[in-house]
C-alpha cells in the first residue's frame, strides 16, 4: 500500500520531525505479503470511501490489507484519523483531532451491512480531548451495528481511557462480543515505545472488563522485535492470565518510517511458535503468534475458535 500525504500542508507526525532517522533493517524472507488490488479489495475500498470512513488497515499501514480487503474484511477506525497520543511505533496521524462526526455510528452500521460481515472489528484513535475518551461514541457505534446487521458479532479494540472515570463502564454496557485492548509491549519498553500509556492501567482495564461482564471475551496483543527479552514476554503472559484475558496475539513490529522506533530484530517463525506453545500452556483460550499476526487479522475465524474453546473448557459459549 502507498499512502500519499501532503506533508507541507499537514505533517502526519509533527512530534517526530526532529527525531534522528533510525536504521531500517532489511525484512527477512518470511515477511512477504500480497499486494492489494483484487476485485474484493476494490469493492471494500469503494464502500469505505462512499461512507466517508477511516480504517486502521490504511491509517496504520497494516501489511495484511491486501488479504483482508480481498475478503471484504476491514477494521473500522472511528472518531477521526488523528490521535492525541504520539506512540513511537504507530503510523496513525497525531495532532489535535476534529469534532466527532455524530453520524459516524450509523455510517459504520450501514457499511457493515453492505459488506455482509459476520464479524467486525471497531477500533479508534485515542481521544484524550474528550471528557469520556469517546466511550459513548463506541457504545453508539455498537448499537448501530446491532440494528443494521443483527447477525454480526462485534469486536472492539479500544484506547486505555486513561483518567476517564466511568468510560469503561459505558463501553462494557453496550456488550461487545470481544473487548480488545493491546498492551503493545513489555513494561520496560513503555517509556520509549508507548510513553502516554501506563502498563498496569491497561492491565487493570482488561481485568475490570471481566469483573463488569464475565461473558465478554477479552483479548490483548503485543509486538515483538522492539528489544524486549523472552522472560519479559513470558511475564507479560502471566500478567494477562492474572487479569483473566482469554486471547493473546503476538506479532512482529514493523517500522513505519525512519522516524519511528527502530526494529531491533526480526523474531523467527520458530520463536513465534514457541511463544504460542507457552501461551496455551499458561491457559489462554486462543493464541495467535506469527510474524504477520495483527490484532484484527483473521478476527472472524479466530472468534469462532475462541467461542468453541470456551465451550470445550467451560461448557458454555
UniProtKB/Swiss-Prot annotation:
Residues 69-285 form the Radical SAM core domain. It holds the Pfam family Radical_SAM. Pathway: Protein modification; protein lipoylation via endogenous pathway; protein N(6)-(lipoyl)lysine from octanoyl-[acyl-carrier-protein]: step 2/2. GO terms for molecular function: 4 iron, 4 sulfur cluster binding; lipoate synthase activity; metal ion binding. [4Fe-4S] cluster 2 binds at residues 83, 87, 90. SMART domains: Elp3. Its cofactor is [4Fe-4S] cluster. Binds 2 [4Fe-4S] clusters per subunit. One cluster is coordinated with 3 cysteines and an exchangeable S-adenosyl-L-methionine. Residues 1-21 are annotated as: Disordered. Its EC number is 2.8.1.8. Residues 12-21 have a biased composition (Basic and acidic residues). Keywords: 4Fe-4S, Cytoplasm, Iron, Iron-sulfur, Metal-binding, S-adenosyl-L-methionine, Transferase. This is Lipoyl synthase. It comes from Xanthobacter autotrophicus (strain ATCC BAA-1158 / Py2). The gene is lipA.
